Amino acid sequence: MTASLNIAPDIKISVNQTFGIESDMEVDAFSKKSEFVPEIDKDYIFDKDTTIAILSGFNFNKRVMVQGFHGTGKSTHITQIAARLNWPCVRVNLDSHISRIDLMGKDSIVMKDQKQITEFKEGILPWSIQNPVALIFDEYDAMRPDVAFLLTKVLEAEGGLTLLEKNKVIKPNNYFRLFATANTIGLGDTTGLYTGTQQINQAQLDRWNIVTTLNY
C-alpha cells in the first residue's frame, strides 16, 4: 500500500446543509480532498435513517453495518457520505476467495543492497487501521470463517490488530472507521436469492454497534 496519510479532520459540517436532512447534528470532516476520497455524485439522494446511522459511525467511531436487498445502494450510500466529508475510503469485497493472507499481508521477495531477501508486506487491513480511512467490507455475509475470526478484535472500538508475522500489535488510528454491507445480516439465506452467503457467529454480530436497513 501507499505511505501513511498524515491528515486528520479539521472542520465541522452541518448535516442539514450538506445532506438535506433535518438535523442539528454537526460532524467531523476534512477541509481538503486527499487520496482515496470518492468522487461526489451531486444527484445522489440520501435516505434519512441510513444517513444518520452512517454519520454516527463517522462521528462517534461506531461500527456500522448496512443491510438490504441487492441494488439498493448500500455501499454507495457510505461512499457518497465519505465523499462529502472528504474522508479517505477503501472498499474490500469479501467474497469467498478473500483469505486472511489477502487482508493481513504476506512475504514477498524484494531487492535490498543488491540481494534478494524475503520481506513481509502488510496488506490492506493493517494499512487501513493505521490511517484515517473508512474501510468498507462489501458482501460481509459471504466471507470465509477464518476471515470472520480475524475481524472480531478489530470490531471493538479500541481493538488493536496483532500482526503475528512481525510480532507487532497495531493500534488503530483515531480516525479509522469500519463499515460493512450485507444482504442477510449473517443469518443465512432462506430465500434462495443470495447463494454463497454464510451464517455469521453471533458473538461477532454483536460487536457491530449499529445495524441499519436500506431497501427499495
Regions found by a protein language model. Give the residues of each.
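AAA+ P-loop NTPase catalytic core and its hallmark functional loops
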Residues: 1-216
